[in-house]
């Protein structure tokens, strides 16, 4: 299946198909593809073809595949020096596109921390083929001419310069631009939930206006002083000339007078120029101030109009719901009525006339510092060396036997949503401070662990002898991870840097899991789960989100790996885009859209899953997912059909004679009797609508457990306060934690700056339980579990854990 590259997005190719024949080195595992207009198979797709033809892939040699006679493109025009348009550097480089075209010459422009490329210099005026942000990118030198730029997610550029000198010039310029971009990013980023970007822009604009005004005043003062001192000098010289002095002195005075006259003429010209500039600056300053005030007034009017439209839209929706019958599967519901919970209050308006109050169950209290044996500083700052007594051990045993089945009900807090969300349009939400009113009492690490809710699908897959059948269960597991999102419209807490979460279900379910927040900017979490039933799941996910006014887009970046121990089958896939609709008015509802390609890197088997976006005008079932399981030759063996919130079925495909294409359902209708239900969603617990629509697993995730690391999400105080319904205290505690994280970051930056000044080495922040290295399969830089957490837990040795709470 050809992995074509869209604008600025690079599609990784499998690149793990064994190369029979006498081919040279295989291609890099991460596909380099061209940008928009360079569509074609990524470097990993045609591995077998390249090997048969005998041509090495774009490795160190940089030769395009296509047979022994292929040659690299002519390396005549490498990167030029600094170009125009304010760019730090621009020039020609060779970029790997695909196995058919190999390396192609592209015009690259490095400016403002962004590396963009075009097919030609003339194309800069209208079409950019791709852009990568260096602030989050990694630059790797392969050999004398080749280097790689990757952001660890969907973008990877394999580049080649015309010479080693040219390559070094580009790499140096890129490293400098990256350092500057990272510094600017750090200056504007004070915490995971930092001050509003719009407020920062406003402050910067006001500061600029004040500076300009001050400079204009200085210019006016200098103008007056030059005129004053010039006149005084001329007068003094005239008086000196009129005095009776010897002839020789008179000659000297005449020379000085001539020079003073030249100075007067020159200074008068400068004074006139300054006066003209001053008048022009004052005129334009007034125009700018008027324009700025006009834009402010327009913004206020636009906000008022948008708010009015939102209210009208809300009234229309309510009137429509009251006058008509909703379809069988509206976007705010999931599945059939028999297993659907009663809907919660989804209308995000300020009206509270329909508030409902419930009797909340008892508050969950958390023992302090039990089970933590630290060699260094303790969480509270005082040394604590508490061992588990017999009574506490008994309590833990009881906790293991009985998992909690409920949490305190969600309180009804009034909130002026519009006052917060109107400033978020087009922004990255991880940079905007949000009250806990928008949250659910779980962290992103715990949400990531929820992917294991249907772990039994991987247990079944591990027992499959047929790799294609195994792929069906892996696909069902992939879809099942979205079933918990159908009602979950609240956001999880952003983890603090170094925060962890463990889930030890080795005795009950045969698996255990550990997550860690490994990066603060961009926010990234690493996850590793292992099962005694024969599988390992690992991933590093970066979450980016944009608020578009009516909806919120959440785009997870990163690759998920699943390895089966007995067969060595190694599967990878990426997540789709999640969209939250009706942010301002109406009932919040969530949709998943996009495609997932699951690849078995050992056999070459693939599964393509399509998440169909919801449409009011479509007659198709809501939340539909379709899929095909194919062998390396592209032949379809199984078709998948279902919904991401309810269930997934598969059936064998009996292709028509000589026909391999067409729709999977049309080809497989003959084998309807072979349909097998792979997965079905578990019903939600009773009263789930009052408990954030948590599943049975989610209800247990924040239950306090002894012996965990002091950085565990269960010990996060603002999250615990929110779960117990004390939201005002939770907001105050959240601000304290963010300020503490901010101070820690500034301390690390100061230490790094001092080390740079002293010329001493300084190690950047490193994750505690994960190591950043190149993935052997995808060749991406990612965090892989180092294998020490459970040993430290057994010893209760948490001395290396940072104090983050």
From Swiss-Prot:
Question: Where does this polypeptide localize?
Answer: Cytoplasm, Cytosol; Cytoplasm, Perinuclear region; Golgi apparatus membrane; Endoplasmic reticulum membrane
Q: Which Pfam families match?
A: Oxysterol_BP, PH
> Where is the motif (FFAT)?
356-362
Residues with the modification Phosphoserine, per the entry, are: 188, 191, 196, 236, 238, 336, 343, 349, 377, 380, 383-384, 387
Q: Per the database record, which ranges form the PH domain? A: 86-179
Phosphothreonine: modified positions: 375
Q: Where is the composition biased (Polar residues)?
A: 376-386
* Stored SMART domains: PH
Q: Where is this region: Disordered?
A: 18-83, 331-351, 369-388, 708-764
For domains, the record's comment is: The FFAT motif is required for interaction with VATA and proper localization of the protein. The PH and the Ala/Gly-rich domains control cholesterol binding without affecting 25-hydroxycholesterol binding.
The UniProt entry's sequence similarity note says: Belongs to the OSBP family.
Protein name as it appears in the record: Oxysterol-binding protein 1
